[in-house]
Amino acid sequence: MASNFNENTRVQVPAALHLCKLGYTYLDDISDFDIKTNILKDVFIRSVKRLNPELNDSDCEQLLGQIVGILKNDDIGKSFYSMLSSNNGIKLIDFSNPSNNEWHVTTEFTCLDEDSGDNFRPDITCFINGLPLAFIEVKKPNNHDGILAERDRINRRMRNSSFRRFINLTQLMIFSNNQEYDNDNRVPIQGAFYCCASKTKAFFNVFREADNSFVANYPYLPVSEATEKCILKHRNCIVIKNLSDYETNKDVNTPTNRILTSMLSRERFLTLLRYGFAYVNRSDELEDGSKTTTLEKHVMRYQQLFASLAIRNKLDNGVKSGIIWHTQGSGKTALAY
């Protein structure tokens, strides 16, 4: 039976199940999607019409075509992100009411470039209103090279123009081997990390939850036995359902499940999508004295996220001014976007 415990059973299936506890609906049979982007066409059109009642099916089809077009831009998704996060014009997401959006999750959904034939399959993909905005790659625990291999793999994908639309569309990428961080090693060998798109290489960030009660007290939704069997059957591992190790790996407090709650719970994910990404033109001086400019995309570090949430809480309580204390040597320049 030990052979059944691989990435699927140790991390992937429990993670997909955990996302259902966070309010995502699992999809095991996807047929109506845009092949160039993996956008779920039926869900997208239905959601956009709901958020923009003045639009009809034809308008939404044209909007989808526009999105597919700009996702090919060599801009790390900047044009699309401006459209996604904007509070003006056509709404792709309702940022103020999570329940007014459609949340889906699936596993092993292939990203295929028809022209080159190149493809990759994220272990888990998360959708909001049909848009695949996050994916999770998992490795089994105690695989010394697992996280480093994932970092090398995503770097190759980011540099491959065949995958540009998929990378530009994906806002958040999470990588985990379901172990606690190795704080003695600066190289990301074990733990749960996150990053965003890049033109060259990914920067893996750690995430440390500031609210000790957030994960434990989150209002998780019950998941039906039918949904659990659906996921297990889709991944062809229903035989492990009643094994003790499988039950252990479903705990909300595993490293993978903790980062999913912290970053992909519906309210948190919407906050990140609205405020958590910045595009920066970095200038570098070459050996001959000339200068070159490179467009970079940055995602909030966890310190910035919790500072932002604290500011929002103060504003909600009528506080109009305050100070954020950023200690010496803690990366003020790197975080000041």
Question: Where in this protein do the model-derived segments appear?
Answer:
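ATP-dependent helicase/translocase motor core
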Residues: 2-337
